[in-house]
A protein has these predicted regions:
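Generic structural "secondary-structure junction" signal
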Residues: 6, 10-14, 51-52, 136, ...
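Structured C-terminal cap/extension of enzyme domains
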Residues: 31, 192-289
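Short secondary-structure transition/capping segments
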Residues: 50-53, 86-87, 111-114, 142-144, ...
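A general structural signal for well-ordered alpha-helical segments in protein cores
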Residues: 23, 55, 59, 85, ...
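Active-site beta->alpha loop and helix N-cap motifs at the rims of alpha/beta catalytic domains
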Residues: 2-141
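Short helix-capping segments at alpha-helix termini
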Residues: 64-71, 94-95, 124-127, 151-155, ...
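Catalytic alpha/beta core domains of metabolic enzymes, predominantly
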Residues: 123-124, 135-239
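Gly/Ser/Thr-rich helix-start
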Residues: 4, 17, 43-46, 77-79, ...
């Protein structure tokens, strides 16, 4: 689970159905342009807004593209409850090389209960877990000690870590991680996290600029930093409104999906936000597009 993994949007048709053809085209484009793997049914994919039948369509399309390229597929499977997370994990394990399971949100369980949650989900399936730590969304912050306890579980292959910055707990975890793959999930922080020892990143922005993110991850200190600095304005613009609205609009403008639609309660982005993001995209260095 190293390198850059593109967190895929779920395209919709103008009639509001899942656009399997656009999803296949986007997934294939990402892999053909250097990303190491794909992520399906994450937050970027509006997984919570899909029906069970639509989620299965997404999984089938992404599995076929990933297997055809020999690339790993990470699949989102987790919610606030342990029993429901186990159910989702069992339903989706057959499609996945790893399951992305969020820290239980809103309830703010104890640290011990969070560790037990991941142990229970991991015991229910035969594929490894990537716990998803995103405290500014879940409302549950975990100290480095607990993050390392989670990483030490046999069922855990690594972690998607989104702290919204690089804090002391992040530094401690990276310095002490027991041979597990820490993947940065904050697109703007992937490069500095890589330099500090992260194994890679899970990036929504890599849907639009897969070559640039792949090159940034492979680059040495000078080249990687140059690409990071070039990508930062694009990442900031793509997240300037609730995601993935701006990203989908840019993907449609770039011809990578057919329609930019998002589902309620998300709304179409302001044209100015899309223009800013596209300008940053087109300003990327030659060879990075």
């Amino acid at each position: 689970m190293r390198g850059i993994h593109a967190s895929l949007v779920t395209p919709f048709t103008r009639a509001g159905e899942v656009d399997a053809a656009s999803l296949e085209r986007l997934a294939a484009h990402c892999l053909a342009n250097g990303v190491d793997g794909l992520v399906a049914l994450g937050t970027t994919g509006e997984a919570a807004l899909l029906t069970p039948e639509e989620r299965r369509t997404v999984l089938e399309v992404c599995r076929d593209v990933a297997r055809g390229s020999g690339a790993p597929l990470i699949v989102g499977a987790g919610t606030m409850g342990t029993a429901d997370s186990v159910r989702q994990a069992r339903e989706r394990a057959a499609f996945a090389d790893a399951l992305l399971v969020v820290v239980p949100y809103y309830l703010r369980p104890s640290d011990e209960a969070v560790v037990e949650h991941f142990a229970a989900v991991g015991a229910a399936v035969d594929v490894p877990l990537l716990p998803y730590n995103i405290p500014y969304r879940t409302g549950k912050a975990l100290p480095a000690e607990t993050l390392l306890r989670i990483l030490a579980l046999d069922c855990v292959a690594g972690m998607k870590h989104c702290a919204g910055g690089i804090d002391h707990d992040t530094l401690t975890m990276l310095a002490s991680s027991p041979g597990k793959a820490v993947l940065c999930g904050d697109d703007a922080y992937i490069y500095p996290m890589l330099r500090l020892g992260a194994a890679g990143g899970i990036a929504a922005c890599a849907c639009l600029a897969p070559s640039a993110y792949a090159a940034m991850a492979r680059g040495d200190g000078t080249d990687g930093l140059k690409l990071h600095n070039a990508l930062l304005p694009m990442a900031q613009a793509l997240f300037s409104e609730p995601a993935p609205a701006v990203l989908k609009a840019c993907l449609a403008e770039a011809g990578l999906i057919d329609d930019p639609a998002v589902r309620a309660p998300l709304r179409a982005p302001h044209p100015e936000s899309v223009a800013t993001a596209m300008a940053a995209f087109h300003a990327l260095p030659d060879g990075a597009l």
